[in-house]
Regions:
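Active-site mouth loops of central-metabolism enzymes
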Residues: 9-25, 70-82, 140-156
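Alpha-helix-loop-beta-strand connector modules within alpha/beta enzyme cores
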Residues: 49-73, 118-141, 184-203
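Conserved N-terminal beta1-alpha1 strand-loop-helix module at the mouth
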Residues: 1-43
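Glycine-rich anion/phosphate-binding loops
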Residues: 76-93, 117-121
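Hydrophobic faces of well-ordered beta-strands that scaffold small-molecule active sites
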Residues: 8-16, 41-43, 70-74, 99-101, ...
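Glycine-rich, proline-tolerant flexible connector loops at the mouths of alpha/beta enzymes
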Residues: 17, 38-58, 106-118, 170-186
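Active-site/ligand-binding-proximal alpha/beta "capping" segment
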Residues: 129-173
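Short, acidic/polar
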Residues: 20-33, 55, 81-88, 153-163
Length: 204
């Protein structure tokens, strides 16, 4: 397990293209990234799953062509159970073992009046689905050194984060931050709360 090793590791995040014409340029960029031998390459997922097939194609190409571990993002907001199950099967078929399980950004035109009826309201719902699938995925989740914008306070945010880890998250990646002290304080608080999984700092 790469993140369990006590050595400095570097990873990259790749954004899938929105158009077919840009796919070759992304492949070229990933070829250059692979030469740096990163610990892994993370491949994001389009809002609402719009570029989800590109996510898998790019992740599989990096893994198969360069032998670099890949982390495929998977979001669940506005998704049906059938859609998520299909995506899980596609990820398994592609040989991808690492998944970043996210709720995803809520589309601006989405009806928010009946959220209680959504199949996947939070990332934890997707994490549970992945665990119940029977596949041996390594599941990652997001965390927020400055607290999630929808949380009332950081204590509540860390409580929900602990639930995510208990549900099956094996590592966490932070949202981008610009003050190292925010990260240090956050790490102290989550360790106090019993969250012991590796934390990847998201920087740009």
């Amino acid at each position: 397990h790469t993140l369990a090793q006590e050595t400095l590791s570097l990873s990259f995040e790749v954004f899938p293209p929105k158009q077919d014409s840009a796919f070759d340029s992304v492949k070229k960029a990933t070829e250059e990234i692979a030469k740096l031998r990163p610990a892994f390459v993370s491949v994001t997922y389009g809002a609402g799953g719009g570029t989800s097939q590109y996510t898998l194609d790019i992740a599989k190409n990096i893994k198969d062509s360069y032998g670099v571990s890949t982390l495929a993002h998977l979001t669940c907001v506005s998704s049906t159970k059938e859609t998520v199950h299909r995506k899980i099967e596609e990820i398994k078929a592609a040989g991808i073992e690492n998944i970043m399980a996210l709720r995803g950004d809520i589309p601006p035109d989405m009806d928010l009046s009946h959220q209680e009826k959504w199949t996947y309201r939070h990332a934890i719902d997707l994490i549970r689905e992945l665990k119940e699938s029977g596949a041996d995925f390594c599941i990652g989740g997001a965390c927020y050194p400055e607290k999630h914008p929808e949380s009332h306070n950081q204590k509540e945010d860390i409580h929900f984060l602990k639930e995510k880890v208990d549900a099956g998250c094996e590592f966490l990646t932070t949202q981008m931050f610009f003050d190292n002290n925010l990260l240090y304080n956050f790490l102290y608080k989550i360790r106090e709360a019993g969250i012991t999984v590796p934390v990847v700092a998201g920087i740009m």
